[in-house]
C-alpha cells in the first residue's frame, strides 16, 4: 500500500489515475471525491470500477497493471512499427558496453525496458523481458485469436 497526499488540491471530485514506468495506466471509472478526509482507492482489487474494457489484468479478486510499454506510447506492441520488443533490443545493442552487439547482453539498472522488474534488462535467454510483453499480448482477453501482432491499447486514455 502506498499513500498519496495532495495538500494544495481543492476539495472536489477527481479521476484517480495510476501509472508505473512500463505499464499501461489505469483510472477510476468515475470521479472520486477528494477532500480533507482520507479516501481509499484500491486498484489491486478487481471490484474497483475502472475506466475502459480490460483496463487491468484480472486474476480472481486481484488485478494488476498491464506491463510492457517500454517506449511509453500507451500501447503494448510486440510486432511491427513502434514495437516495445524492438525498443528493448535497440537499447541493448546500442549500449556502449555491448562491444559484440550481442542480443544476450544484460543491463543492470532501473529502466523502462526491465519488464519483469528484476533489475536486469534482457532481450533473450532465461528470465528475459520480452516474454512479459508477449505474454500480456497473447493472453489479453480482447486478443481472441492470440495474435502476436495484436496491440493492447491503454484503456484509461480511450
Predicted regions and their residues:
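Cellulosome-associated attachment modules in secreted, modular CAZymes
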Residues: 1-158
